[in-house]
Regions:
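Short, hydrophobic/aliphatic alpha-helical segments
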Residues: 1-11, 40-43
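Conserved phosphate/anionic-ligand binding catalytic regions in large, soluble enzymes, centered on
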Residues: 9-26
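Alpha-helical support elements that line or immediately flank enzyme active sites
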Residues: 21-33, 155
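Non-transmembrane, aqueous-exposed alpha-helical and coiled segments at domain scale
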Residues: 32-41
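A structural-propensity feature for long, helix-poor, extended segments
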Residues: 41, 45-84
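Short glycine/threonine-rich loop-to-helix capping motif typified by GTGT followed
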Residues: 51-59, 101, 186-194
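Contiguous domain-boundary segments centered on the initiation and propagation of an alpha-helix
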Residues: 66-115
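A conserved regulatory-domain signal marking ACT and ACT-like small-molecule sensing domains
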Residues: 77, 91, 119-221
Length: 221
């Protein structure tokens, strides 16, 4: 157990699970969408639904969607900032079955017409898990430089992506592969030991059969 696990992150309170973690969920969801959300339909599950409003979970999620960090003093006023930014937000409750008690379903629409559905959980101490993207099961938290590649479920893509990273001396710490159905869309999540050069990311985006590439950089957090 690290000191971070005991003390938690630098944040605007009151709770590392219901506030700091919720901000990070919103922030990473915005990054995965790839642009500023213009609308967000958010459904809270379990403990988030029961006590989230009193702990500021709703405002924290919105703050993250606006690009705020857990220590941003504007978090308590995030609804006002969302209105100024032209972002429409609705809240409800959802039964996500066996999901972690501090979970939320976010259905996002972006200013460029993009749409995305994300299920995420706050695990405590500011740590989170992205549990599903557009119905495809995933499991990552953005605690190290992370590459999320959405591609066609066909042979060769795993080797191609790994080779691109190897050419830049980027070491892959963990790699997880997910797919909705055989031959459909698949998701690769690669957690790396160092930051990935922008030219490498652009090279991956230009590969045939790669549908979307998202990079979670620690330098941006």
């Amino acid at each position: 157990m690290s000191l971070f696990d005991i003390l938690g992150p630098v944040m605007v309170g009151p709770s590392s699970s219901h506030t700091a973690g919720a901000v990070r969920i919103g922030y990473i969801a915005r990054t995965l969408l790839g642009c500023k959300p213009v609308s967000a339909d958010i459904a809270l599950h379990g403990s988030f639904a029961a006590t989230g409003k009193g702990h500021g979970t709703d405002r924290a999620l919105v703050a993250g969607l606006l690009g705020m960090k857990p220590d941003d003093m504007r978090i308590p006023d995030s609804f006002s900032w969302a209105e100024k930014a032209g972002m429409e937000v609705t809240f409800g409750e959802a039964d996500l079955k066996e999901a972690h008690p501090n979970s939320a379903l976010l259905i996002l629409s972006g200013e460029e017409g993009s749409k995305m559905e994300i299920v995420a959980a706050s695990l405590g101490g500011g740590r989170i898990e992205i549990c599903a993207i557009d119905g495809i099961h995933t499991s990552f938290g953005g605690e190290c430089p992370t590459l999320i590649v959405r591609n066609l479920d066909q042979p060769g893509f795993v080797t191609g992506v790994a080779s691109e990273l190897s050419d830049e001396d980027v070491n892959i710490a963990t790699m997880h592969l997910y797919r909705g159905s055989r031959g459909g869309d698949a998701v690769m999540v690669l957690e790396c030991d160092q930051e990935i050069p922008e030219k490498t990311i652009e090279g991956l985006r230009n590969m045939e059969g790669i549908l979307k590439v998202t990079y979670l950089s620690l330098e941006e957090e």
